[in-house]
Each structure stands twice: as structure tokens, then as C-alpha cells.
From Swiss-Prot:
Biased composition (Gly residues): 1-10
Gene: rpmA
Cellular component aspect of the GO annotation: cytosolic large ribosomal subunit
Entry's Gene Ontology BP terms: translation
Organism phylogeny: Bacteria, Pseudomonadati, Pseudomonadota, Betaproteobacteria, Burkholderiales
KW Ribonucleoprotein (keyword) present: yes
Keywords, in A-Z order: Ribonucleoprotein, Ribosomal protein
Annotated region described as Disordered, given as residue ranges: 1-21
GO molecular function: structural constituent of ribosome
Protein name, UniProt field: Large ribosomal subunit protein bL27
InterPro entries, sorted: Ribosomal_bL27 (IPR001684), Ribosomal_bL27_CS (IPR018261)
Top-level taxon: Bacteria
Keyword Ligase found: no
Family per record: Belongs to the bacterial ribosomal protein bL27 family.
Length: 86
């Protein structure tokens, strides 16, 4: 008979890779057309002027300019816009 239990596999050791979500360019910072502003799950922040929405809800700039955040509407939803460079 074995004097020790078999060294079975542990039940730990699994974790998903982080998805690197969040704001990539903050208010007042310059951004080029096509640059990613926010990576998010769902529309936590909504697209404003000159901002496009990707199929994974990523917000990106449609023109060169500066990023501007605002809270709009009675529901106080956060919106992000790009103010074109003058």
C-alpha cells in the first residue's frame, strides 16, 4: 500500500487574462483620427460628436482634435466628444 496519497492536481491555478479596459485618452488630451478613447463593456460612456463606436463598444476618434467629456441629459449619462483641431 502507498504510504502517501497520490499528488493529485490542485483545484487552483486558473485565472482569465485581463482585458485592459478603461479610458485610454483623457479629457483635454490630443488624439488622432482612429485613435482609441475608451475600451468598455457595454455603453458605460456614450459617443458624442466626432466619436465612433466599434462592435465591442470601443469609442474612437473620427477626426484629429482634443477629447472632451460631458454629462448630458436627465439621466446624467456620460458622453465623450472630440473637438476638431483648429
Amino acid at each position: 500500500m502507498a504510504q502517501k496519497k497520490g499528488g493529485g492536481s490542485t483545484r487552483n491555478g486558473r485565472d482569465s487574462e485581463s482585458k485592459r479596459l478603461g479610458v485610454k485618452v483623457f479629457g483635454g488630451q490630443a488624439i488622432n483620427a482612429g485613435g482609441i478613447i475608451i475600451r468598455q463593456r457595454g455603453t458605460r460612456v456614450h459617443a458624442g460628436d466626432n466619436v465612433g463606436v466599434g462592435k465591442d463598444h470601443t469609442l474612437f476618434a473620427l477626426v484629429d482634435g482634443h477629447v472632451q467629456f460631458a454629462v448630458k441629459g436627465p439621466a446624467k449619462k456620460q458622453h465623450v466628444s472630440v473637438v476638431p483641431a483648429a
